[in-house]
């Protein structure tokens, strides 16, 4: 297509909003911990990330949203690798997370994990992306994905999987250490969130990451060959 543009410096900026879906193509490695209400699964998989921009919002210099404009954009697909965890729905109740806070807890934990991973694996925040959902069609449970933003993967998800225990624990510690009350760009807000950083629950993320650390316990991070030479399965 052809776009006509003009040079201008308006008193507002635009932020896109996008829908993202992740389809699990092949599970490379999975580990299961706990049982019943404390059941947690962590894994590494080949995935297809489908992203489609649906609208954008105009924000004034004060941060106030002026309006939201619908757009008709084609979806984009990325075949890559993702590290993930999914949990039994009862885990939230078991660890004191209210049902209405579950989406925000997952979303905030995802954002914080994306912010922390570069410190562990040496990537940039822009090199990775994520998705959280209270119910994923492939796992059948509440799930958080963090994926490489490059075709066929770049190794960041693999390293995140190998260092999952340290990653989750340090992510929780970073949120707790932040002095804000309800979440800020230093802990759970993301500059590239396609949902406008909504919903987010700082307390829910702390409780969720604490629950994961509790279930995983003193599990050592995986040795490199555990993640790089897995027994694959297909969904």
Task: Please place each PLM-identified region on the residue numbering.
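Cys/His-rich metal-chelating microdomains
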Residues: 190
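Short, non-ligating residues that shape and space the ligands of small metal-coordination modules
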Residues: 193-194
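Short cysteine clusters
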Residues: 178-187
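Extended Lys/Arg-rich polyanion-binding regions
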Residues: 1-178, 197-212, 216-219, 224-228, ...
